Amino acid sequence: MPTPRRRVAAYVIRHRAGPELLVFDHLDIPDAGTQIPAGGIRADEDPHTAVLREVTEETGLDLCPVIGAVGIDHRPHPITGQPRHTHVLHLHAPEDDHDSWIHTVRGTDTDAGLQFACRFVSLPLSGSLADEQDLFLGRLDPDWTTLTRR
């Protein structure tokens, strides 16, 4: 059995009139679906370091404090079946007035140069995110469980 790929995913939450989650859509790959910041953990990184890097690379946001670990998703990749362990972490969004923006992915990974349409959406979500990335939202607050999962 192949070694599982180590990954991170970020629930970046802010509180306005109610709780909101940072999500994005690929402008270059519209069929990819709405997602949260996520990606691989490099050999020299721990999940905390990796999630901060991924959030900055994929959204441009930095200074998002990590609140804590939410859980580890052991499901394989939905298309390739490759085993993976995704560490889901809860982060607090920086104080900012931006509700939505376009970001060009930075870094050296395969998504470098892609454009993401980032935005905050109200919780609970009405439907699932790509790859069921919303699976653990209810662990942060049962009221944040995606409506289609109730």
What are the residue ranges of the model-derived segments?
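Short coil/turn motifs at beta-sheet boundaries
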Residues: 3, 80-84, 111
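Short hydrophobic/aromatic beta-strand or adjacent loop that forms the aromatic wall/cage
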Residues: 5-9, 84-88, 115-116
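Nudix hydrolase/Nudix homology domain
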Residues: 30-34, 99-150
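N-terminal strand-loop-strand
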Residues: 1-36
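Conserved hydrophobic/aromatic beta-strand scaffold that supports enzyme active sites
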Residues: 23, 88-90, 120
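The catalytic Nudix box helix
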Residues: 36-69
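Active-site segment of metal-dependent pyrophosphate-handling enzymes
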Residues: 60-106
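Short, charged/polar surface micro-motifs in flexible loops or helix N-caps
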Residues: 15-19, 29-31, 42-43, 90-98
